[in-house]
Structure formats: C-alpha cells, structure tokens
C-alpha cells in the first residue's frame, strides 16, 4: 500500500456527458458562443468538443482564423483535464490580440 492510494478512497468515475456540460458552461463563461458543436468569438472558431464513448474530445485553434484553422486536440479523461483545458484556453484568449480575433 502506498501513500498515493489511501484505503477506501477512489476517484468518482468520469462521466463524459456531464463533463461536456461543464466544459460548455466554462467556454460560455469565457465569452464564447456555441454554434453546431463549435465555440466562436467574433465569428471565428476557437474551440470544439464532442463525446466519444468514455472520452471527451476537445480541441482549440492554434490561432484564430476565418478560413481553415489548425487544431490542437486533447482527449479529456477526468474533471481535472476539463479544468486544465478551460484554464489553458483562458490564458490563450488573453494572449491573442484584437488583430488576431
């Protein structure tokens, strides 16, 4: 038995459908608008998310673009992954200037 695994303690199971709702709420809080499974700001796609079995697949653009954006994919397997994705996107949104929007 190690200190990492205390007896009688286990993380709650990951529920991707509930995590998707949490992610959507977090992205709306960042000022993004949801359209057809994608999240936009000023008519430019910024992020997308979809449930695939036991995983939540999320992606964000490397830079905002009206044409075909480059995506950075990230599978979300836990509530912590969802929080990290939202926090990372928040930092990225702050770094992009208005001319990139």
Give the location of each predicted region.
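Charge-dense, helix-prone N-terminal extensions
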Residues: 1-101
């Amino acid at each position: 038995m190690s200190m990492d695994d205390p007896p009688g303690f286990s993380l709650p199971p990951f529920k991707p459908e509930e995590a998707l709702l949490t992610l959507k709420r977090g992205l709306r809080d960042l000022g993004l608008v949801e359209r057809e499974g994608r999240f936009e700001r000023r008519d430019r796609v910024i992020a997308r998310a979809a449930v695939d079995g036991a995983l939540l697949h999320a992606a964000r653009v490397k830079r905002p673009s009206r044409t075909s954006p480059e995506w950075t994919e990230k599978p979300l397997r836990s509530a912590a992954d969802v929080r990290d994705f939202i926090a990372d996107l928040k930092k990225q949104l702050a770094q992009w200037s208005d001319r990139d929007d």
